[in-house]
């Protein structure tokens, strides 16, 4: 019957989903390093720490995480900046403490990720909610899967 066929297909898809794609330990460590450094780590440093070339790290990271290491670091740095903006820190303070070259660098990153200004992001604290920004983050670190 169709119900049985759908049940078989559903069970097969569920098994595939639960197995999930595996993540290389080096990629997981690179991600952990990016998060621990709040996005303030150079891709060259990550490559040295993993023992891979910059090109191999870039390729494996992108295929397994879905972002390049540089883009992931920018996103993590932005996330911390958004938290600080939502907490009421000025854009100048956030830029200085967040590793941005200057306030206009922060402005460009905020605009790039949100399409809004730092002032608008400060008024939208939902952008800085961890369980929205990083769903499954803890699971990723424990399971080694995104």
Stretches found by the model and what they are:
Residues 114:
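A glycine-rich, hydrophobic loop/mini-helix early in the fold
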Residues 61, 73, 109-110, 122:
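DNA major-groove recognition helix of helix-turn-helix
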Residues 80-84, 105-107:
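Histidine (H) residue identity feature
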Residues 1-54, 64-68, 83-86, 90-101, ...:
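Alpha-helical bundle regulatory/interaction domains
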């Amino acid at each position: 019957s169709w119900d049985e066929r759908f049940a078989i297909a559903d069970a097969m898809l569920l098994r595939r989903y639960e197995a999930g794609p595996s993540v290389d330990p080096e990629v997981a460590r690179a991600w952990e390093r990016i998060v621990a450094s709040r996005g303030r780590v150079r891709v060259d440093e990550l490559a040295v720490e993993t023992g891979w070339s910059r090109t191999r790290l870039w390729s494996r990271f992108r295929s397994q995480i879905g972002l390049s290491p540089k883009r992931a670091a920018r996103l993590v740095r932005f996330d911390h900046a958004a938290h600080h903006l939502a907490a009421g820190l000025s854009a100048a303070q956030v830029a200085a403490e967040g590793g941005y070259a200057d306030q206009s660098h922060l402005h460009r990153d905020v605009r790039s990720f949100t399409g809004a200004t730092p002032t608008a992001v400060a008024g939208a604290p939902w952008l800085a909610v961890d369980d929205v920004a990083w769903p499954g983050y803890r699971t990723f670190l424990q399971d080694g899967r995104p």
